[in-house]
Amino acid sequence: MTYSYTQISQYLSCPRRYRHRYLDGWQEKDTRPAMLFGRAFERAVAALFRREDPAAVLCEQGSQSKDAGLTYSGSDTWDRMLQQGVQLLERFAQDGRVRIRRPRTSQQVQFTRVLGSGNSFVSYVDAIGELDGTPCVLEWKTSSARYPEEPAGISALDPQLVCYSWMTGIDEVAQIVFVRKRLVEVQYFRATISEQQRQEFASLVDDTVRRIDSGWFLPHNGIRFPQNPCTTCPFVGLCLDKSDLVETALVRKPGVDLGLFDELSF
């Protein structure tokens, strides 16, 4: 069996949700424009480092999603998101703070580990390069709001960055956040992951996989305000046995969707 960070995160969020998605085959409908934009934008960033036309790649990828029945929030439209994306690419290129020396082999890099249980764990790292001259693992993120900058080094607590450090053995990690707002902004965060953090994450993975293999899928009930994750969970219709909610939010894929390549952009 092969696991990924996404699967571990889903299980820790709610074991029942994990079962609905990865064992029963239910999957959330792709109606969230921010998610589809993020995928298209990552492809455009990769094209930028390959010295291709990133704006053309973004628009080409975006044209496939424009008429997909997406649900927008506020004043967002697909054309507006694409315009912001082009502006972010231009700002990022002007900053010139990130370098990838081998862009054809150092982007979307696959790493695999064999766990103590005999299962495998796979990760796809956005890129391995340099931020301000420091070699590091690079992660691209798109957001409609700025990430907090204080306290300094807060990104070292991001579990996905810890995961990337554990998988690659690289201490230095960096998160590049492309912020879509009226005046676009690119944020740069770098952190150092300790050996203790990597070992703790490895233990967390082993423990979680052990529970999954044991068929332990109890629900994490969340209707206790103000902590109410169940109200925004796309799988809530399954837990409430309400077919209308299921039909609105989910589709069922034939067979089991193991989600092994959730983090693979292309």
Region roles according to the model:
Residues 15-28, 64-69, 137, 145-146, ...:
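Short amphipathic alpha-helical segments and their helix-coil junctions
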Residues 1-7:
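Short acidic, Pro/Gly- and aromatic-enriched capping/linker segments at domain boundaries
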Residues 154, 165-266:
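Metal-dependent nuclease catalytic regions and adjoining charged, substrate-binding loops involved
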Residues 8-53, 82, 107, 232-235:
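Nuclease catalytic cores
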Residues 103-210:
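Mg2+/Mn2+-dependent nuclease catalytic core
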Residues 33, 37, 81, 157-160, ...:
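Hydrophobic (often cysteine-bearing) scaffold residues that line and stabilize catalytic clefts
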